[in-house]
Amino acid sequence: MEPLSIDKPFMYFDEINNELEYDPDSANEKHKKFPYQGQLKLLLCELFFLSKLQRHGILDGSTIVYIGS
């Protein structure tokens, strides 16, 4: 198997439905209430992203190997 190099990721999140779901104020948030809340949020966002790909049929016929954070 030959490695493949690409200029950008396969797909950006906003390319699925042309919506950018980013709140610029999130950079100014206060510290989290418990130490691993950020990792939990990241995991939930990753799962949400995969489910969104599935709902739009982008993953049809694909095998997904998920290596999470």
Swiss-Prot record:
Reaction equations catalysed: a 5'-end (N(7)-methyl 5'-triphosphoguanosine)-ribonucleoside in mRNA + S-adenosyl-L-methionine = a 5'-end (N(7)-methyl 5'-triphosphoguanosine)-(2'-O-methyl-ribonucleoside) in mRNA + S-adenosyl-L-homocysteine + H(+)
GO cellular component: virion component
Molecular function terms from GO: mRNA (nucleoside-2'-O-)-methyltransferase activity
Cysteine pairings via disulfide bonds: none
Compartment list: Virion
Enzyme Commission designation: 2.1.1.57
Source domain of life: Viruses
GO biological process: 7-methylguanosine mRNA capping; methylation
Residues noted as binding mRNA in the record, renumbered to the chain: 22
EC primary class: transferase
Record flagged with keyword Transferase: yes
Main location, first listed in the record: virion
Keyword set, alphabetical order: Elongation factor, Methyltransferase, mRNA capping, mRNA processing, Protein biosynthesis, S-adenosyl-L-methionine, Transcription, Transferase, Virion
Residues reported in the UniProt entry to bind S-adenosyl-L-methionine: 39, 66, 68
UniProt feature coiled coil, ranges: none
Protein biosynthesis recorded as keyword: yes
Family classification: Belongs to the class I-like SAM-binding methyltransferase superfamily. Poxvirus/kinetoplastid 2'-O-MTase family.
Oligomeric and partner information: Interacts with poly(A) polymerase catalytic subunit OPG063. Interacts with OPG109 and OPG123; these interactions might help linking transcription to capping and polyadenylation.
Functional note: Displays methyltransferase, positive regulation of the poly(A) polymerase and transcription elongation activities. Involved in the modification of both mRNA ends and in intermediate and late gene positive transcription elongation. At the mRNAs 5' end, methylates the ribose 2' OH group of the first transcribed nucleotide, thereby producing a 2'-O-methylpurine cap. At the 3' end, functions as a processivity factor which stimulates the activity of the viral poly(A) polymerase OPG063 that creates mRNA's poly(A) tail.
The protein's name: Cap-specific mRNA (nucleoside-2'-O-)-methyltransferase
Taxonomic classification: Viruses, Varidnaviria, Bamfordvirae, Nucleocytoviricota, Pokkesviricetes
The encoding gene: OPG102
